[in-house]
């Protein structure tokens, strides 16, 4: 298996070199329609490599994180909400195939048993929020991926799907407290944020001067908070990229990464 994984990584790196891919800004990408097409094809090609050990992300977020980080091994991720850590996971492949470590956070009880079983990293069951130590109502819904804090259950197009739910109280932890609790490095390779509505509240309270992220993916579900998140990230030195691929996520990299 190790030999096959090494071969896969070498093939990816060779293809990237031959295609001379540079992610660039969204504006630059739009001027290069052919390049956009080739990048999209490359993502699809990468998914076919190494048999069943493919992307677990819904929109190839794991492949994006690997590309930005030059397919490094031993990177560091932070992902919330993590669900069961395997299906529709943005970090499963990073951990299992590339030896990354990191933190997963998931307050929905329905996922906890399998999350512990499926992953070998730090797992936090408190709910990530703008403040630590609050006790808030949380709606765990039948479609588990849509579970969220009760105050956000009616905030997007999935409000009707959240009507069948179990509500219970969760303790909260801020993002900065989460990172410090698990001694996260000051430079984190990938941050994945999918909390069904509370993303802006969480990131607005975060001190971006304390930690740097090589890439960030944030679910927005086309709510009014999408552009507010973009403004917040831009004010803190990040730029949005690959809008044509990211669907109801937005993907960000540091402005300083000019070669991407």
PLM feature spans:
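Phosphate/nucleotide-binding beta-alpha loop and adjacent structural elements of enzyme active sites
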Residues: 2-260
